[in-house]
Amino acid sequence: MKKILVLITLCLFASSPAMAETLQLLTWKGYAPKELVDKFEKETGITVEVTYSNNEEMIAKLRATRGAGFDLAQPSQDRISSVQAEFGLYQPVDYGKIDAALFIPSMLEAVKQNTLVAEKSYAVPFCWGTSGLVVNNAQAKGVTSWKALIDPQYKGRISYRLKRPVLIGLAFALDYDPFKHYGDEKGYAAMLEVLEAELIKAKPLVKNYWSNGDQLLESVRTGEVTVAEAWDNGAWKLHDENQAIDYVAPTEGALGWIDTFAIPAKAKNVEAAYKWINFIMQPENAALFTNAEKTPTASKDAGKFIDAAFQANFNRSFPQQVIDNIKWYPPVPANIEAMEGKVLDRIKAAN
């Protein structure tokens, strides 16, 4: 009988499939299109489980687990070095496992430098874009400045996220250079005091503080909001539906960001993470993402597969002088981010 049980057990193990591989991906909504997930799973046999998040939530989740629970995350490049230095949330990138030929060289190098901690780099680029304004030009003509977000003539039709872009954009509009103050805590605090007062005074002008892109798009689509802080890709989606709505890069400069791939410190399936990176950065796959999400990719040769509609949006919004005026986020020091968080909390709580 024992021999029979042993044989049955051996047969069961022999007939069972190998343990299925899983990639736990912590990312922004839209960054893992279903078509690409399905294609990756078919090609590799690796199941992709996606958790949607944003910069603040990614940091909070990874801090809570000390870098465990996920195999790959996608923070913005300016939000990596300070949290890595303080909390050790990520592991260094093994560039030997990255197909560097897939990336725009200057962007790959910039992210290497901007995520450098103790002579090791912690991310590679995925995509980039800007924060600026989405404007319904039929209802709010001539908007060109970040100051539109505190302009009484748009009372009840203004929206923005209570996050750092509105602080940074308004700072530039009020003739500060916030990035130059990163090393001057006292000067940065004085600037934040001015911004806090302006945004509290302007609270009665605000229709809502949006918290996700779909909420913003719907409020602009329905006409509830006519001027809002927004990402360029969301504005382009609305423009495709209604040409009166479009993206406006403020005259003080749109705010440029790069979202990345970073591998958490306690990732269980590191090899799957590198496979996903090299897969989604292949030109045709990267272009599929760009065409769907209207977000520029860091994939070097994706341009030949990007559709004409996206190219038209990009060319209309970003003539060369606008590109030259983009204010790119440098790595934000932890003390600066903490100061901003307290200011944003006070603005939210103010009556």
Roles of regions detected by a PLM:
Residues 21-83, 217:
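Early extracytoplasmic/lumenal segment of secretory-pathway proteins
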Residues 192-202, 241-265:
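Periplasmic-binding protein-like
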Residues 79-82, 227-244:
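A ligand-binding cleft/hinge motif common to bilobed small-molecule-binding domains
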Residues 74-217:
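Extracytoplasmic ligand-binding site segments that recognize negatively charged/polar headgroups
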